[in-house]
From Swiss-Prot:
The keyword Nucleotide-binding applies. Molecular chaperone. Has ATPase activity. This is Chaperone protein HtpG. Residues 1-331 are annotated as: A. GO terms for cellular component: cytoplasm. It comes from Wolinella succinogenes (strain ATCC 29543 / DSM 1740 / CCUG 13145 / JCM 31913 / LMG 7466 / NCTC 11488 / FDC 602W) (Vibrio succinogenes). PROSITE patterns: HSP90. Gene3D superfamilies: 3.30.230.80, 3.40.50.11260, Heat shock protein 90, C-terminal domain, Histidine kinase-like ATPase, C-terminal domain. InterPro entries: HATPase_C_sf, Heat_shock_protein_90_CS, HSP90_C, Hsp90_fam, Hsp90_N, Ribosomal_Su5_D2-typ_SF. Keywords: ATP-binding, Chaperone, Cytoplasm, Nucleotide-binding, Stress response. The gene is htpG.
């Protein structure tokens, strides 16, 4: 017998399960049946691809036994089974990044934490909501040894060798007194039909029935056990689709929409894709796994292939079932398979069309974009084939709509007469951008400016130069300035302020690229802008946060722009005290940086200079 200690995250999860206040405890059975179905699908695939298992004879099925008196519930399957190391990995640690994300959200407040269970499938551990002891007996297909895993969910578990005739897994739950309803026929039937009716393997419920004063053992297949996606959509109800989504995704929320398509002709395949209503915790993790399963002629092949859909649609849940791929197709072949590439391209277009359809309902789409907009934006970076469609789906805050995001089409429809470009400003958040000095001239002209205020915008939006026939221009760029040449700085002004510019460049040497006059300001004395060939400030900040020290390149220096019409700038021109002029130069630069990014690198220096200036003024 080997005693093991649970990983810390597992202990946290178990503590939540054991003391759970979550009312919908019946989901534990959905989770266990789903795991059993996964085990059967894995074995089905291996019997086609693994030489050692090709001749394996077995009947794929899930069996459920119960004993009302003893309060014992037993679930078994004829799937792949586990060996000792599988038991440690699957039941003793948390390998799934999503589960780790779930655990990291736990607050210690039992009521709040229990509510999280409904937003996330917690797999095997959900059984501890209803059981105070669990015994798992398992044998891996193709191996001789069998093992028993036992735990009461109190920090450790035991693994011991045991005997088991055939491959597969049996899970025995010793139910808590108050959960004995889960050892009754009517309750189990109800739960199976509610959550697992469309599991593609038969689920048999075993019970005893009195006949002529004799106890007679019976078994009854409770679920329909058919591939829902293969049924004509005309024969399916809305409720059928919703139930199947929940069993497929472990999501307790209803999906927002779905697309069910059967394609016939030179290629034959069926797809069923769902748009979830809530984003999973780990959607933006590097190791996030796709939610789409690939089948060939109803045989499960993989759910871990990044070639099934583009990565920006990784939030989509669903099924691809092909008639043309070979059953023993390998993952390496999948990556270069023309049939799958065609399915991927057609599926992407269908999903985007459904999202476009969803966008007709403004309220629904606002909620959807809040959850998945960031992922969709990633498509602008790599999916050039669908770039125009994706642009129609984008939503942004703006100077006229700081609280509600708008489409590019909405912006276009309310452009000022004679306006020939879409103007934007990039930064950290809409509140900061709304108060940017760079907006002043545009507000005066009543020209709307889009806010690219998410981290992802600084990467993807520079790739978007055009919307229809309209160019996109950053308002701090020379390109945007050319649109208003009638307000450019005169030669006379340049000559008049030349001494001040030289003095500032000397005082700020090493901190800026240059100092110049600008007509883009109205009420502010100064602002900072990036040189045209340099990355924008938002991108610089994001790269710094990601730990990327901008590669081998030094951090780009900003350009300081002064407003020649501002009284303060005029007074600085007349100031003869070099030390004070230097302090003012630094203060103006710091103030401009603060308004641009909301933070300063040298806050202490800024405070000292500000205090010195106040001291002189008092």
């Amino acid at each position: 017998m080997a005693k093991h200690t649970f990983q810390t995250e597992v202990n946290q999860l178990l503590d939540l399960m054991i003391h759970s206040l979550y009312s919908n405890k019946e989901i534990f059975l959905r989770e266990l049946i789903s795991n059993a179905s996964d085990a059967l699908e894995k074995l089905q695939y291996l019997t086609l691809t693994d030489e050692n298992l090709k001749n394996l004879q077995y009947t794929p099925r899930i069996d459920i036994h119960f004993d009302e008196e003893k309060k014992i519930l037993t679930l078994s399957d004829t799937g792949i089974g586990m060996n000792e190391s599988d038991l440690v990995e699957n039941l003793g640690t948390i390998a799934k990044s999503g589960t780790k994300s779930f655990v990291s959200r736990l607050s210690g407040d039992k009521k709040k934490d229990s509510a999280l269970i409904g937003q996330f499938g917690v797999g095997f551990y959900a059984a501890f909501m209803v059981a105070d002891k669990i015994v798992v007996t398992t044998k891996k297909a193709g191996e001789e040894s069998a093992y028993a895993w036992l735990s009461e969910g109190k920090g450790d578990y035991e693994i011991t060798p045991c005997s088991k005739e055939s491959h597969g897994t049996e899970i025995k739950l010793f139910l808590k007194e108050e959960e004995k309803e889960f050892a009754s026929r009517w309750r189990l039937e109800e739960i199976i039909k509610k959550y697992s009716d469309h599991i593609p393997f038969p689920i048999f419920l075993h019970y005893t029935q009195k006949k002529n004063d004799q106890e007679e053992s019976k078994e009854e297949q409770v679920n329909k056990a058919f591939a829902l996606w293969r049924i004509s959509k005309n024969e399916l109800k809305e409720e059928d689709y919703k139930e199947f989504y929940k069993s497929l995704s472990h999501d307790s929320h209803d999906p927002l929409a779905w697309v069910h398509i059967k394609v016939e002709g030179s290629q034959e395949y069926t797809t069923l894709f769902y748009l979830p209503s809530k984003a999973p915790f780990d959607l933006y993790r590097v190791d996030y796994r796709s939610g789409v399963k690939l089948y060939v002629k109803r045989v499960f092949i993989t759910d871990d292939d990044k070639e099934l859909l583009p990565s920006y649609l990784r939030f989509v849940r669903g099924i691809i079932d092909s008639e043309d791929l070979p059953l023993n197709v390998s993952r390496e072949i999948l990556q270069q398979n023309r049939i799958l590439a065609n399915i991927k391209s057609a599926s992407t277009k269908k999903i985007l069309a459904e999202i476009e359809n969803l966008a007709k309902d403004e309220e629904k789409y606002e909620a959807f974009f809040k959850e998945f907009g960031r992922a969709l934006k990633e498509g602008l970076y790599g999916d050039f084939e669908n770039k125009e469609k994706l642009l129609e789906l984008m939503r942004f805050h703006s100077s006229l709509s700081p609280n509600k995001k708008i489409s590019l089409q909405s912006y276009k429809e309310r452009m000022k007469e004679g306006q020939k470009a879409i103007y934007y400003l990039m930064g950290e958040n809409a509140d900061l951008l709304q108060n940017s000095p760079l907006l002043e001239k545009f507000k005066k002209r009543e020209i709307e400016v889009l806010f690219f205020d998410e981290e992802i915008d600084s990467i993807v939006m520079p790739m978007v130069n055009q919307y229809g026939d309209l160019p996109l221009k950053a308002i701090n760029s020379a390109e945007a300035d050319k649109d208003f040449e009638e307000e450019s700085v005169s030669e006379e002004e340049k000559e008049r302020f030349k001494p001040l510019l030289e003095r500032f460049e000397k005082a700020l040497s090493g901190e800026i690229k240059s100092v110049r006059l600008s007509k883009r300001l109205v009420d502010s004395p100064a602002c900072v802008v990036a040189d045209e060939d340099d990355p924008n400030f938002a991108m610089i900040k994001m790269m710094r946060q990601m730990g990327n020290a901008l590669g081998d390149f030094p951090e780009p220096k900003p350009i300081l722009e002064l407003n020649p019409e501002h009284p303060m700038v005029g007074k600085l021109l007349a100031l003869e005290d070099e030390e004070r002029a230097s302090d003012y130069a630094h203060l103006l630069l710091d103030q401009a940086k603060l308004l641009e990014s909301g933070s300063l690198k040298d806050a202490v220096g800024f405070a000292k200079r500000l205090n010195a200036m106040l001291e002189r003024a008092i």
